Design a protein with these regions (language model features):
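Non-catalytic structural scaffold of enzyme domains
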Residues: 1-266
């Protein structure tokens, strides 16, 4: 039987998964969340599938054996593509992954031309290619790997000239091809929404995945009788190289306090 008081684990390569944690907190106000960010090894998007899978395994074992989490949210597209299926083979709890919102983007696009910004690892993965096969439905889906954007978020450079220049490099070719919908295929990218909006203008719809992931998490917890129905939920953060990243963490999650930010011990 699920212990409803147990925390929910949230795993990401860095701080971008806080965009998913934000959606989880809004939908599940009573839950305690334990957020693990492997900032010291980020980015994961250019690492091998084997490396990402082994690292996710290591963090997942820590969350289950030390903290007894009742569910695990992979708040990272690269981690989902590389490791979700493997983690589900041994974890005795729900494992909720994240995927680029190709299906809803195709459904709402008026021009039948959709852009996807993601990491190279996500775009090259069989899981993403399967997503396109199932849901592109004849639309022109322009997939662009965007190295450097994740690092902009990790450094707290959300709207600097350098960040805007990088965004233009990736997005302007999509705009010339006629996209009217842009899918953010990395959980870091929602923190660049204002900068992205400056480049794409007011008429392009920007889709981020946090709300959909939170809805799935709520359903899976309900299915396992794991929903916590009362109390004020708390967050605890395990960050690799926490001192280096604590300032940006506090910008992205102002409620974080020094005593709730711990060093990921491996």
């Amino acid at each position: 039987m699920t212990d409803v008081t147990a925390p929910v684990g949230v795993l990401d390569s860095g701080l971008g998964g806080l965009s998913v944690l934000r959606a989880l907190r809004q939908r599940l106000p009573h839950e305690d969340f334990l957020y693990c960010a492997d900032c010291g090894n980020a980015p994961w998007g250019d690492k091998s599938v084997q490396w990402v899978t082994e690292r996710c395994d290591e963090i997942a074992h820590f969350l289950v054996s030390v903290h007894g989490v009742k569910a695990l949210v992979l708040a990272c597209n690269t981690a989902t593509a590389a490791a979700a299926d493997h983690l589900r083979t041994w974890m005795p709890i729900p494992v909720i992954g994240i995927e680029p919102a190709v299906k809803p983007a195709v459904q709402i696009s008026r021009t039948h031309c959709v852009g996807v910004l993601a990491t190279a690892g996500t775009i090259a993965s069989p899981r993403y290619q399967s997503l396109l096969t199932r849901f592109a439905d004849g639309a022109d889906v322009i997939s662009v790997g965007a190295p450097g954007l994740m690092e902009c978020v990790e450094r707290g450079e959300f709207e600097t000239p350098a960040t805007l220049s990088l965004i233009r490099r990736y997005v302007e070719p999509m705009l010339k091809k006629g996209i009217d919908t842009l899918v953010l295929g990395c959980t870091h990218y929602p923190f660049l929404t204002q900068a992205l909006r400056c480049v794409v203008g007011p008429d392009v719809t920007i889709l981020e995945p946090g709300d959909a992931v939170a809805a799935v998490a709520e359903t899976r917890l309900a299915d396992t009788a794991g929903l916590k129905a009362a109390g004020c939920g708390r967050e605890l953060f395990y960050i690799r190289d926490s001192e280096k990243h604590e300032t940006v963490l506090r910008v992205l999650w102002p409620a974080a306090r020094k005593e709730t930010v711990l060093e990921l011990p491996f």
